[in-house]
Swiss-Prot record:
GO terms for biological process: regulation of translation; translation. The keyword Transmembrane does not apply. Keywords: Repressor, Ribonucleoprotein, Ribosomal protein, RNA-binding, rRNA-binding, Translation regulation, tRNA-binding. PROSITE patterns: RIBOSOMAL_L1. Part of the 50S ribosomal subunit. This is Large ribosomal subunit protein uL1. It comes from Rickettsia typhi (strain ATCC VR-144 / Wilmington). The gene is rplA. GO terms for cellular component: large ribosomal subunit. Belongs to the universal ribosomal protein uL1 family. The keyword RNA-binding applies. GO terms for molecular function: rRNA binding; structural constituent of ribosome; tRNA binding. Pfam families: Ribosomal_L1. Binds directly to 23S rRNA. The L1 stalk is quite mobile in the ribosome, and is involved in E site tRNA release. Protein L1 is also a translational repressor protein, it controls the translation of the L11 operon by binding to its mRNA.
């Protein structure tokens, strides 16, 4: 995928054309300027999400070049996150008290099998993974399968729920080494958006595969939902 393919083209209505005029596709921006530009170019009536696309110099088809992890965004995501906890009965009250929206075991598994997935994050205790394996093919493609590397298979239910609710974002490089994530609402203060951006970009940089040859960080683009897209000057990171 070329940089040109990644860049979001804006055309059509008058509002979109006006927004397009406020950003230049051939200009590189630092993070501060990029956030300012995207805010000034936003025209939608709802509160759009600040989105990031990172192109990495990796080949995810190779097991030693998989880039994946989670980031706790300092300012949160601005979204209401519904958390399901699959655990044994003796820990259900603990999960409920910690803020879980859906708690149980076989009842949740049955709902998943019937197509009822009313949660954004699924947390499980290790002793429930054999049961959850029966719905792995359903949860996996949706990015909802509990994973110890992501902190969603754990004995520390309380902390896992807290992280999920407070703005924990999962990232994973897909085909062509592309990572995409939402990092907060455009209504956030510039300072909060920059905190989230720096935390996310920093985490991805730290996740660079050991021994990778060549350039790791190829390009970064920021955009808002249905809005403009700007390319980041990598030398400013």
């Amino acid at each position: 995928m070329s940089n040109k393919d990644i860049f979001v083209k804006i055309s059509g209505s008058k509002k979109i054309r006006e927004a397009r005029e406020k950003v230049k596709s051939d200009t590189l921006y630092n993070l501060t300027s990029a956030v300012e530009r995207l805010k000034s170019a936003s025209y939608v009536k709802f509160d759009p999400t600040l989105e990031i696309v990172m192109k990495l110099g990796i080949d995810p088809r190779h097991s030693d070049q998989i880039v994946r992890g989670v980031v706790n965004l300092p300012a949160g995501t601005g979204k209401i996150i519904r958390v399901a906890v699959i655990c044994k009965e003796e820990r259900e009250e603990e999960a409920k008290s910690a803020g879980a929206d859906l708690v149980g075991s076989i009842n949740i598994i049955d709902e998943i099998k019937s197509g009822q997935i009313n949660f954004d994050v699924c947390i499980a205790t290790p002793d429930m993974m054999s049961m959850i394996s029966s719905v792995a093919r359903i949860l996996g493609p949706k990015g909802l399968m509990p994973n110890p590397k992501l902190g969603t298979v754990t004995l520390d239910i309380k902390n896992a729920i807290k992280n999920a609710k407070s703005g924990q974002v999962e990232y994973r490089a897909e085909k062509a080494g592309i990572i995409h994530a939402g990092l907060g609402k455009l209504s956030f203060s510039d300072q909060d958006l920059l905190k989230n951006l720096n935390a996310f970009i920093g985490a991805v940089i730290k996740a660079k595969p050991v021994g990778l040859k060549g350039s790791y960080l190829k390009a970064i683009y920021l955009s808002s939902t249905m809005g403009a897209s700007v390319q980041i000057d990598l030398t400013s990171i």
